[in-house]
């Protein structure tokens, strides 16, 4: 890993020296490409414009170093991440086209005007295989958590924007754990609004969706749940001044479970539909502490509101007519 870090720093230094005063514009273009606001071809074109012909290789070396560092570069076709290197033997672009025009003029009149298919000049559609730049998609596109390599690459770009030279492994690990815990808090807030749960130590929520629910019309029900005694976690170690916590006796635990079952309701809660955007919207409105930053909270609330949808009366009527037509074809009758 130290070799990759040294190679990345050396490639960044060489690229900065080659860019000179255009280094800020290059970092801005790199950020836009990483956010998928510009394509790889546009980024290469801008880099080719900022660099001289002799320094184009520094751009390629830097991209190779940063992709190797993030372990994103797995198998790319030859030349996919490089700019075209023409060197000193570049041919003049106007000669071949000029020859074609002269030869076409010398053709006979009968061969000049021939019916031509307009689609023949269109670019042939080729299905793009999921490789190369597909690994750079945002997690909002893939619907999956960002990988460690993607987070490290994003942090490297952000560090370069703020004048930092490198990102440590400890910082990447901290961001990975922070993302996981943040999503767990959001899921906990959503599930706690839909299902009953128990609380340990006054704040730790557990046993979501338990079938044993308290009966609010029984006085003993509240007492039973408030006086619930459970064993400590298996990994808890006693302190120096504390005695080790003892596990509850099996007979006492069995009596306690029977008492809770007797004090619970006689009907099970109805099954709920899958979690939708309305559940997420309500959970974020009730638990504002899940997203403490007001800017991020307001932006996500706007996105959720834009995706809220429910059928209106016309759509429901059209759906009913459609179902009746399908039933008529099958020889059935819908009421």
From Swiss-Prot:
GO molecular function annotation: transcription coactivator activity
InterPro entries reported in the protein's UniProt record: Hfi1/Tada1 (IPR024738)
One protein family per Pfam: SAGA-Tad1
Swiss-Prot/TrEMBL GO biological process terms: positive regulation of DNA-templated transcription; regulation of DNA repair; regulation of RNA splicing
Superkingdom: Eukaryota
Keyword Nucleus: yes
Keyword Nucleus: yes
Subcellular location(s) of the protein: Nucleus
Keyword annotations: Nucleus, Transcription, Transcription regulation
GO CC annotations on file: cytosol; focal adhesion; nucleoplasm; SAGA complex
Family assignment from sequence similarity: Belongs to the TADA1 family.
Subunit architecture: Component of the STAGA transcription coactivator-HAT complex, at least composed of SUPT3H, GCN5L2, TAF5L, TAF6L, SUPT7L, TADA3L, TAD1L, TAF10, TAF12, TRRAP and TAF9.
Function: Probably involved in transcriptional regulation.
The name this protein goes by in its record: Transcriptional adapter 1
Organism name: Mus musculus (Mouse)
Lineage of producing organism: Eukaryota, Metazoa, Chordata, Craniata, Vertebrata
